[in-house]
Amino acid sequence: VKGQLPCGVVFFVGYLFDGIRTNSGRGKHFSSVKTPQLFIFHFVTYSVLNLFTFLSSYDKIITYMFVNTFKLLSFLAFKLLIMKGSFCMPITEILERNAREFGNDVALVEVNPEIRETRRVTWKEYELIEPNPVCHYRREITWSVFNEKANRFANLLLSRGVKKGDKVGILLMNCLEWLPIYFGILKTGALAVPLNFRYTPEEIKYCLDLAEVDILVFGPEFIGRVEEIADEISKNRLLFYVGENCPSFAEHYDRLTANCASTTPYIELTDEDDAAIYFSSGTTGFPKAILHNHESLMHAARVEQNHHGQTKEDVFLCIPPLYHTGAKMHWFGSLISGSKAVLLKGVKPEFILDTVSREKCTIVWLLVPWAQDILDAIDSGEVTLSKYELSQWRLMHIGAQPVPPSLIARWKKVFPNHKYDTNYGLSESIGPGCVHLGMDNIDKVGAIGKAGFGWKVKIVDDKGNTVKRGEVGELCVKGPGVMTCYYRDPKATAETLKDGWLFTGDMAQEDEDGFIYLVDRKKDVIISGGENLYPVQIEDFLRSHDAIRDVAVIGLPDQRLGEIAAAIIELKPDHPCTEEEIMAFCQKLPRYKRPHKIIFADIPRNPTGKIEKPKLRKIYCGESLVAKQNHG
């Protein structure tokens, strides 16, 4: 005992120092802790832990028991404090914790590789997610490797002069590198700026300039598009390439990060620090840069776990693209619980069911068309459920578009044991969850639900006054996830943010039980298969056709996609044109922007010259579009 006593003292002091350093913000994040609970909690916990370690240093078995017991209690209390919002911290700290607590556990799995772009053309044919039909492909990383990759990229950025407040763009398809790159950016204090993988070269340049991006990280699918603008965009920024066969105008991400330290950079982060910029477009079609801080990101993680109850044993299947706030913020539930997530590159029913079966997925986030395709494939015999192990699948939830009640009724007949939830949100509200249905309210399918965890909602008239229950007004939300502003657009910010309330542009009404239903859209946006289409972009393109005098693009209800773009076209006199000719002309557009329906008719305009789209919707829809979808 005498010989081991000095070792015990050293062990005690070392544990105490390490506990305070690593679990209380490493001594550099105290400014982000709004209350002293975090410091006190870890100090006391590790003091007791180290006391037992010291007292039992002569007995390895007792040491093992006490150390691991208090580690477990520390972890459980830590999670409880996060869920109750007792203290705040940057989202990067959760990754650090996972690397310490669950280092050898699988964090991310990528199933099926992406389609490689040859040059400039094939990207126009992209669906929402594209699989490679040639071969099955799978790779994975653990939490410790995830954190190590994030640290290496962070240290690379710092070595290139990136500092707090700089911006780093991400132009990647879903892949195993995406999230470590995102977190590497956050660890430097820089802002992550995800870009839509469907952007044209002109849109990429516009967004890089608008957000004042300093570095762009891009993948092989974007070589053609980036090459077109490389001379312009590389003058004031660095280009990093992720993948094989690095083009000459960029630097190779893998080679650069391989030589960087894997240790965590000590950069002070607070809740109020800017964290990310996401892009959204208004009715003009020009992207707006949406600025969020670290508090927004952390709140998104709390919301997701509170709504869906993720535990360490859950496995989340993520299919939509990670540049969306929706996909990433739903994944934050896996992050905060330390559980596994699977990135699937394919939307065919057999792909989804096979992945759920192989990876033992318990939570699946779908869009309406994918859920419909699964049910149709089951009904037609295209897939046989008995081939798959699906008993662990507990929750299916849908967001990004109105959900027909008939779809969920069909789903529950096939999967009666599944919980179901609807999530409503905007990029301006850090994605899904500011309003949600709730897993126990399936009788209210068709509604978007009630205020989410930590959120407030109200419905107002044109003067900003709260309307009576049952009356239609504009939906407004307020909470820690509301954007800071539209970056470099104070006018749009002032129109959207008022006294902390985010005016969504969606018209809604509340029923007698307090559940909110969307009625129509104030904003002129079409949501097709979960993706936003901006009519003005399609209209501007169609107006370049020699035979077209005037055009208006509206959304029409579609059972599978929710909405489809319909072009009402007024032809010039003596310029005959057929639907087939218009469709052929539209092949120049990316596939997702092409109108699904062509209608030849006069375009009504009001006295000020504005197209009367409400009148067109009434003519061709018969009722407000969202209400019609809700009745599906």
Language-model-derived ranges and their functions:
Residues 103-106, 258-279, 286, 309-315:
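Conserved pre-ATP/AMP-binding loop-to-beta segment of ANL
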Residues 298-315, 323-363, 377-378, 383:
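Conserved AMP-binding/adenylation subdomain of ANL enzymes
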